[in-house]
Amino acid sequence: MSFANADTPPQVVVLGAGAWGSSLAYVLNNNDIPTQVWSRRSPQSLESMVAGADVIVSAVSIKGVPSVAARLEAMDLQRRTILVTATKGLDPETMTTPSQIWQAALPSQPIAVLSGPNLSKEIDQGLPAATVVASSDQAAAEEIQTIFAADNFRVYTNNDPLGTELGGTLKNVMAIAVGVCEGLGLGTNAKSALITRALPEITRVGLHFGAQPDTFWGLAGLGDLLATCSSMLSRNYRVGYGLSKGQSLEEILANLGGTAEGVNTTDVLIKIANREKIAVPITRQVYRLLHGKITPPQAVEALMERELKAEFEDFDL
C-alpha cells in the first residue's frame, strides 16, 4: 500500500510522550495524519492502541525499548506495519542499537530509523529542519518520508539504518565534551577542533560495524553533531557545561528535565571499544570525567597531550 495514493491517511501511533515523541506527533498532526501518542501513563493499553496501526513510531528512551519491543513481539501485527525508531542510545545489556532490538523482536516488519539535527523545541516552534529516514526497505523509507515531509520539515531517505542510528547516538557523547569546552571558555578554535575530531571518531566506530562512510557526512552524522554541539537546548551539551562549572553529575541530571542519553552511551561505547579495540580518545576522556576520575581541565589536557600523528591516520575511508 502506498500512503500517498491511499483514500484514507495511515493510522500512526507514537510510542513515548517525551519531548521528542511529542514533537514527532506534532509534525504528523500538522500534516493531517491521524496520530495517537502512547506512554506508560496512557489509560489505553499499548496493545489496543497499536492494533491496526499502519505506522508505529518508537520514541521511548533506550531503557524502555526492550520491554516495549517484547510486548509488540507477542502481538500479531499487520505484516506491512512499519516500525520507525527515533530513539538515540545503546542498550547497556546487549550493547545493541534500538533498531537491532526492534529487528530481533519483529523480524517480519519493515524497520526504519529516523534521525537528524532535530532539536525538539525548534521543531515545536515550526522552525525549518531536515531529517533522514533510513531503511533497508526502500519502499518503507519512502512511505515514512511521505507522511513526515512538510514545508518546514524536509525529509531525506537513505539505505544505511545502522550508520544513521550510530551518528545520532554517538554524537551525544561528543556533545558532553563540547559542553565542557564551552563551559571552560576555551574559545572557538578549541571548540572547532573538538567537533572536527569528533566526526572521525564517530565514523571509525560506524565503519567498524559496517556502516556506510557517506552517512556520517550527512544530516544524521555531521548535521546532528553540529546541532547538538552548538546549542544549550541539547541536554548532553548541558551535562558537559555543568560539569565544567563544578556541578556533580547527579545534580545536573536531577535538574535536566529529561534524559541525557550520552551518559549511558558513553559507558556502553567504552565497553564496545575495549572489546573491538576501536580508538575512541574523546569518548575515553568523557568516560573518565563522568566517573570522577579526572577534572574537566585534566580531560582537555589529556586530549591535547596525545601522541602527535597525521590528521587522517587510522581514518581510512
Curated annotation (Swiss-Prot):
Catalyzes the reduction of the glycolytic intermediate dihydroxyacetone phosphate (DHAP) to sn-glycerol 3-phosphate (G3P), the key precursor for phospholipid synthesis. It is an enzyme of class 1 (oxidoreductase). Its EC number is 1.1.1.94. This is Glycerol-3-phosphate dehydrogenase [NAD(P)+]. Belongs to the NAD-dependent glycerol-3-phosphate dehydrogenase family. The keyword NADP applies. GO terms for molecular function: glycerol-3-phosphate dehydrogenase [NAD(P)+] activity; NAD binding. It catalyses: sn-glycerol 3-phosphate + NAD(+) = dihydroxyacetone phosphate + NADH + H(+); sn-glycerol 3-phosphate + NADP(+) = dihydroxyacetone phosphate + NADPH + H(+). The active site is at residue 171. Pathway: Membrane lipid metabolism; glycerophospholipid metabolism. Keywords: Cytoplasm, Lipid biosynthesis, Lipid metabolism, NAD, NADP, Nucleotide-binding, Oxidoreductase, Phospholipid biosynthesis, Phospholipid metabolism. Sn-glycerol 3-phosphate binds at residues 88, 116, 171, 224, 234-236. Pfam families: NAD_Gly3P_dh_C (PF07479), NAD_Gly3P_dh_N (PF01210). One of its GO terms (biological process) is glycerol-3-phosphate catabolic process.
